[in-house]
């Protein structure tokens, strides 16, 4: 089954990224931002593409696998987990967009969208 393969890959990728997140936790907290190395690793692992539709080069991961990925990432660094959770919800919006605007927003490797109140 395709989604099982995607789920296993996503879980493996999350486990592989987790040590980097744990190691960077102090810097992430001090800077109040994910580090460039953390972002690169998360993008390389396609963690921000897990809820994007297949048509937008996403993985459309099922909810149980998403929860497991979120648990792994948040367990390694809560801030990275929060950012990933924001990205999960925002990326789901691509399913309701026409293809061209969705590609404009989510088409590049390092595309990630999050929204919320600015402070």
Q: Which ranges hold each PLM region?
A:
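General secondary-structure edge motif
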Residues: 1, 8, 21-23, 49, ...
